[in-house]
């Protein structure tokens, strides 16, 4: 089953953000709040729940009155098209079944929970995952591989892989030589 990247065919994409009060969640919220084809219907977090979005995030235009809920409350929202998980490393993979995602929902995980094969995941993150859940996820950069998406569970590449892939994509079309990328990072990795 091939799914088309949602924004291409939907006029009003209904979105949820789990982990909306962390760095990744906040940045995603800022981007989606201004997107003409997106309506944010749910903001989840582990703390700062029951607060209005405007009390934590300045500059919002369309999502100011949303109440931040507990991440697990997503179970009660049946009309969400896409759920973005911006939760800390390991939280989604350890608690996947508790969220009870709907069959019609697409889930895009922005953590590293489903990026690495099991042996490397345990080595680097010390987290054991459910193999059946891991198999549902496809590690793919949708912006460059829309037609190759074969699942509703997307494991989005991290900042390094994304910045490199997006930067060299145009060059890759015209060059036949090997491209070497030399990237550096500070302590945070962000």
Name each model feature, range by range.
Residues 2-190:
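N-terminal Rossmann-like NAD(P) cofactor-binding subdomain of oxidoreductases
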């Amino acid at each position: 089953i091939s799914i088309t990247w949602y924004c291409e065919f939907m006029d009003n994409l209904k979105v949820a953000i789990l982990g909306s009060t962390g760095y990744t969640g906040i940045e995603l919220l800022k981007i989606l709040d201004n997107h003409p084809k997106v309506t944010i219907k749910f903001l989840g977090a582990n703390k700062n729940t029951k607060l209005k979005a405007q009390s934590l995030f300045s500059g919002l235009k369309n999502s100011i009155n949303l109440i931040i809920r507990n991440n697990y409350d997503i179970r009660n929202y049946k009309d969400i098209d896409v759920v973005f998980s911006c939760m800390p490393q390991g939280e989604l993979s350890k608690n996947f079944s508790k969220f009870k995602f709907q069959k019609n929902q697409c889930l895009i995980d922005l953590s590293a929970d489903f990026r690495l094969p099991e042996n490397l995941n345990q080595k680097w993150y010390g987290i054991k995952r459910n193999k059946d859940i891991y198999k549902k996820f496809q590690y793919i950069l949708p912006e460059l591989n829309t037609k190759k998406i074969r699942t509703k569970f997307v494991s989005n590449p991290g900042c390094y892989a994304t910045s490199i892939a997006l930067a060299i994509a145009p060059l890759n079309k015209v060059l036949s030589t090997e491209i070497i990328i030399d990237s550096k990072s500070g302590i945070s990795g962000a």
